């Protein structure tokens, strides 16, 4: 094997190592972040008796949490999962925005089956999630 081939093989190995490292670290950063913990352990306004994590884990099938920084530089925690809403089974996506200074968060956007929900629909979905949690708590008593 010539020196040129050795260099090409070496560069390919280095490139693959960098690529694997990037993919591994990017996945870890997205699903394991302090802002995700802030939202999971926090409470939504008007629902101070149960954490966001507990309420949504009861209502969502296989909830998936991830973090990213939006193009607007906002810190976004996104929760997605399957849920039945208004008699229809589907996939919901909720986006919480975390304030970097105060570490407070708010629910900003929500989709159900790729349709953006308006304020009234968001309230209904969140209310249904917390109602589901309450009903399951009563069932365990």
Task: List each model region and its residues.
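Cystatin/cathelin-like cysteine-protease inhibitor module
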Residues: 3-8, 19-141
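Sec-dependent N-terminal signal peptides
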Residues: 8-14
